[in-house]
Amino acid sequence: MKKVTMSSVRKTKAEMSALGSGGLMTGTQVWAQEILESGDSNDFTFGIRSFDAGARTKFHKHSGAQILIIPEGVGSVGTDNETLSIVEGDVVLIPAGENHFHGAPDATSMAHITIQKKGSVTEQTEA
């Protein structure tokens, strides 16, 4: 068993890895921290992503479902058919294979915890 407290999760950008604004990311900066070490779970990945105002992922899909938990900020999650506003406390389930994006609007930052099946493959669908 492993307990992770939010106070033990690195919250300053200096303690997180910069994902940049290229590749899957667009807009301003996105920051990342893996919460589980690679040997902690054979089944899941568990990390936090912090989006500066105006940053988002490009459209993409995963071979496994993705769960997003919003611990702070205001953001959006969109598919080919709809865009939802997300706020602190929201939980979003993105089914495997669903084309989507997630990120922060121009005016505010947003962070989300991401939980995925280990080995899930991400395919970027937006240039």
Annotate the PLM regions.
Residues 63-75, 80:
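Glycine- and acidic-residue-biased ligand/ion/polar-headgroup-sensing regions
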Residues 81-97:
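Short acidic-glycine-tyrosine-enriched beta hairpin
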